[in-house]
Amino acid sequence: IGRTGIMLLSCGTGAWRVRQSMNTLAEQLGLTCTADIGLMSIEYTCFDGEECYSQSLCLTNTGVNTSKLNRLEQFINKFSSEGVYMTGEELHSHLDQIEKIHGLYSPTALGFAAALACGAFTFLLGGGPVEMFCAFAGAGIGNFVRCKLGKHHFTLFLCIFASVTSACLVYAGLFEVMKLILGVSEQHEAGYICSMLFIIPGFPFITSGIDLAKLDMRSGLERLTYAIRSE
């Protein structure tokens, strides 16, 4: 139950969904489960009427992995017909296979996608070709760094710091080179912020609102704080 919960949390899903899934599994196993869920940790207790078991679990980083989330939901939905007849070892082996699922796209592809998106935002915010090019390069490198560090399970704020720093340095470096070679003016620095837009965490913003609406205050406030600090 706890492992399924922490795996769901690692996919970026909200506390209400994690708790609902843990309760579904607990009910099928004849247990009662209470859980305190945050952005990156779960403290839960399971009761069987005679004994209880408590455990605290935590993550080093958070992100979004819809492929893994989909497989976990299938596992939970089929648990009543398949999972209850499996041994503990078989269940953990099945979860091991799910845990190995990575995102559909490589860091290179995600970096290129972020570059296109931030370049487009630069255009929408009134930037010209110079700003768009610099933001494209900065965002691409920055998101590539963030994805690579995330795959190696570095801490959340180290990933944010390193990726934003990379984006800023690439933008500033390209801008200085273009000033020397092409003689562009200082006013083109307006696209500097656009090179960091990839770091804005839209998913935690959405899930924080859902958690707060369901009065899950701890998770909602932690997600909202993370989203604001990331900006």
Feature locations, PLM:
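Juxtamembrane helix-boundary/capping and inter-helix hinge elements in multi-pass membrane proteins
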Residues: F154, S185-E186, D211-R223
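Alpha-helical transmembrane segments and their cytosolic membrane-interface
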Residues: N61-A117, T122-G127, E131, T225-E231
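Soluble N-terminal domains of membrane-associated systems
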Residues: I1-E89, Q97
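Conserved active-site and cofactor/substrate-binding residues in soluble primary-metabolism enzymes
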Residues: T13, R17-Q20, S67-N70, M86-S93, ...
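Core alpha-helical transmembrane segments of integral membrane proteins
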Residues: G103-T207
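Hydrophobic alpha-helical transmembrane segments of multi-pass small-molecule transporters/permeases
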Residues: T4, G191-S195, A227
